[in-house]
Amino acid sequence: MQTHLLILAAVVLLIIHIVNNFLIKPLQTLLKSRRLGCGPVPFEPTRWPLDIDTIRRSLKADKEQRTPDFVAGRFETMGRYTWGLSLLGTSNLITAEPRNVQALLATQFDDFIMGTARRTNLKTALGRSIFAVDGKAWHRARETMRPIFSRENVSRLELLEEHVQTMLQIIETKDEGLTTDANDRAWSAPVSLAVLLPRLTMDSATELFLGQSTHSLKKALARQQQKSGNEEHDADSFDHAFERMLAILGTRMRLRSLYWLYGNKELQKCINALHAFVDSAIDAADQARKSGSSQLRYDFLETLRTRCSDRAEVREQVLGLLAAGRDTTASLTAWVFYCLVRNPRVYKKLRDTVLAEFGPYSTNPGQKITFEKLKGCTYLQHVLNETLRLHSVVPFNSRCAARDTTLPVGGGPDGSMPVFVPKGTEVNFSTHVLHRRKDLWGEDADEFVPERWEKKRPGMTWQYVPFNGGPRICIGQQFALTEAGYVLVRMVQRYDVIEGLDIDVERDWHNFTVVCSPGSPVARDAAVMCRLRVAVE
């Protein structure tokens, strides 16, 4: 008898759940939507239950290094810039409308949060850092980070120069070193800039922020000089662990609420390796502080110690800082060269501009290259802007509705009506699609044309959001632009021609983890393969 009652109770609860979720809630949503003057959005058709086929296609696109274009193709199929999709039993929205992006990031900032699934996934590795928290915890983390990205620290380009010189040594001593052509001009061996640039930015970021560099470029140079032939990272190195952590987190983000099914063991191994390095940096900083030998202008670790509840939180904040200071810069710089090898006209014009502004290459640039001069070099800034327009470091982002709210446009037959967003709905937005809309950017929106930045269009602010916007705008924005600009100047000073060796004229290739970097039809992890000709001034 008792068993029968339990079964009956379970059946009744199941019926109540079904009626509530598939009848009452949709009806309440419809009535509230109409009351607010909102219109419906079309939903992407699905073939498999719970839209599992979308996840399958997304993972396939990632494997084929075409995730941003895969998403753009879905927008084209839907025929509008705001639409819905049902995924794993939940209704989500996706948009590439400037007004909706503005609402998500700024004007309706308090209506949206990171969302539980995304926050919990990132928290596994980044804990209580700025990327994995909302509300007061986010505000506190951002205020802790703000001083490290001050103009004074961003302007410390002399620290970067040492690492640039090491990278140039690697380029010019790879394999048999420089070789000469029929015109007696010196060329480098084939080299992947997408491999070298993340090492450069990690080495400089760890030195600037922690006072202790990872020196991954110096280690690579030593291996090269020893003719070991082994260009792989040490499996336990900080640099390798950081790369693998990002790759795993990227895949887990595409699995959404099922993120916990993938990569747990390897992710934890990576986190342990990263924590070991951070602990050694903390100990070294403590020792330098006690002996009075610390070279840090702003002791970020000491600030963390006073603001964080324990050593574990210090580690988490450091990893968040390195994610902000390393990945944005590395991805941007790699994409710049990805574009330049495909556009020799732009490379020549940029080089002529750089030589006029900063002079020819010298191993000791002194004060010729400064924060102010980089900002004032107009064509250099246009090249950076155009690169970020075509190849956003983060081509997709998302927010979750913290309460019942609306988006300004996208509903109704022509998409001009507001859209009702029930509490808990995830809203995805694609900067990749937004930045390539021909109705906003012209018929040449898919082409690399830095000159388009000579004139600003009305309303451009929310048509162009490579670093997001509003209160959560990327805190490392100026750091990334300054460091990328510096590296670009030094490279075009040194090399007058760059020859791409993995160019595919048919399509772009994207290596998408948590951030998006160039991919390659030859080798995903060795993109922007090129030869460089040493300049003779």
From Swiss-Prot:
One of its GO terms (molecular function) is oxidoreductase activity, acting on paired donors, with incorporation or reduction of molecular oxygen. Keywords: Heme, Iron, Membrane, Metal-binding, Monooxygenase, Oxidoreductase, Transmembrane, Transmembrane helix. The keyword Heme applies. It comes from the Eukaryota. Heme binds at C474. Its cofactor is heme. The keyword Transmembrane helix applies. InterPro entries: Cyt_P450, Cyt_P450_CS, Cyt_P450_E_CYP52_fungi, Cyt_P450_E_grp-I, Cyt_P450_sf. It is a single-pass membrane protein. Pathway: Secondary metabolite biosynthesis. It is an enzyme of class 1 (oxidoreductase). It holds the Pfam family p450. GO terms for cellular component: membrane. Its EC number is 1.-.-.-. Cytochrome P450 monooxygenase; part of the gene cluster that mediates the biosynthesis of alternapyrone derivatives. Alternapyrone is a decaketide with octa-methylation from methionine on every C2 unit except the third unit. All the domains in the polyketide synthase alt5 are apparently involved in alternapyrone synthesis, that is, the 8 CMeT, 7 KR, 7 DH, and 4 ER reactions in the 9 KS-mediated condensation steps required for alternapyrone synthesis. This is Cytochrome P450 monooxygenase alt2. It comes from Alternaria solani.
